[in-house]
């Protein structure tokens, strides 16, 4: 691969996108909601999956070389100057994982103070969890509602110029909620 060559690599080559679901083992291998990438001196890339709670190492041609489970919501990556350690910011559980790049394993996890209210801290991962909310393990509600924001799109693919579909968002127990998906 030369620097001027453009290459597109599927980060989930094990998936059959003609299917709506796969085995639990395949789903667990999926990288969901990639959020950060850092390149090592050898050209390999480290990529975090915020929705799948792991980091992968991929070669310059996109071949997956390693998968490392980390804390919830890995969003940031920093490689040490010597390339021996990869630091991963795990947003949802308020921690930093230290990855030993030689063994491709989590060597340590440091938890830090997170002032986020407990209800939000416990509920936020559900919006991003690609393993629980996707038949293939690579997308979640947050894939369309990026960073839990509203996109203000009608999502009527038959009439893109249509008006926004309104729905009852209260969905309290023992009440009928609108089917909005």
Named regions from a protein language model:
Residues 2-4, 59-63, 100-104:
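Short loop/turn segments that connect beta-strands within beta-propeller blades
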Residues 1-30, 110-125, 130:
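Surface-exposed loop and turn segments in beta-propeller and other repeat-based domains
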Residues 50-51, 91-92:
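Short loop/turn segments immediately following the C-termini of beta-strands
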Residues 33, 51, 73, 119, ...:
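Beta-rich catalytic cores
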Residues 76-79, 83-89, 104-121, 128-181:
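Electron-transfer interface patches adjacent to heme c in soluble/periplasmic c-type cytochromes
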Residues 42-43, 83:
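Conserved loop/turn motif of beta-propeller repeat scaffolds
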Residues 22-38, 73-74, 141-142:
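Signature of short aromatic-glycine-proline-rich micro-motifs recurring in repeat-based ectodomains
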